[in-house]
Amino acid sequence: MTYSRALIKLSGEALMGDKPYGIDPEIVQSIAKDVSKVVENGTQIAIVVGGGNIFRGLKGSAAGMDRATADYVGMLATVMNAITLQDGLERAGVPTRVQSAIDMQQIAEPYIRRRAIRHLEKGRVVVFGGGCGNPFFTTDTTAALRAAEINAEVVFKATKVDGVYDRDPKKFTDAVKYDNLTFQDVLANEIGVMDSTAIALCKDNKIPIVVFNIFQPGNIAKAISGEPIGSRISNSS
């Protein structure tokens, strides 16, 4: 099965590659190249990008900032990443639009659901920045929300690891990878794939989540084509 419309949740950390912070241009171009291939094959792609490579609201809050203020700074960071990703995609030959939940007319369209869907239908990639426009919500929740709004068939969570494990595979060599999980498993066992709000949104709207390693070239195409890759979370195991 090849998905016809998919949403990719791309963490800010993925964009920084091996750097301690910021953006690695080579990573951006690699991701753009992989996305261009699936767009050429007819799949409609939307992307929600995080901002943790620049600023993370929870860390700012822990350091003494007002939580809402810290979250707004984090939302601005996601727009910076979205514009950078747009540049990379367009240099790879992919027409791309950035839509921001926070109004920034000079650099991004406002988020308008029907316009976003129309862009997708025309073969453009839509990158959503600004989170969902409200503090206290993660970009994972934004990904689940936007996926439901644009009728995406699947959410791909593109990360630095090749799936979901019972514990941190970087710390424990005997960590076990899950090939399939149910949403109920994730919620009941508090498995840290996404926050519970994002998981519940996908569960209620019957949108499966596939977690895979973005740094393996060709993985986006494999995921889009329905190949068994990473870990799949759905309503049935």
Curated annotation (Swiss-Prot):
Belongs to the UMP kinase family. The lineage of its organism: Bacteria, Bacillati, Cyanobacteriota, Cyanophyceae, Synechococcales. Pathway: Pyrimidine metabolism; CTP biosynthesis via de novo pathway; UDP from UMP (UMPK route): step 1/1. Inhibited by UTP. Its main location: cytoplasm. GO terms for molecular function: ATP binding; UMP kinase activity. It catalyses: UMP + ATP = UDP + ADP. Keywords: ATP-binding, Cytoplasm, Kinase, Nucleotide-binding, Pyrimidine biosynthesis, Transferase. Homohexamer. It comes from Prochlorococcus marinus (strain NATL2A). It comes from the Bacteria. This is Uridylate kinase. Its EC number is 2.7.4.22. It is found in: Cytoplasm. It is an enzyme of class 2 (transferase). ATP binds at K9, L10, S11, G12, G52, R56, T159, Y165, D168. GO terms for biological process: 'de novo' CTP biosynthetic process; UDP biosynthetic process. Catalyzes the reversible phosphorylation of UMP to UDP. HAMAP family: PyrH_B (MF_01220_B). GO terms for cellular component: cytoplasm. UMP binds at G51, D71, C132, G133, N134, P135, F136, F137, T138, T139.
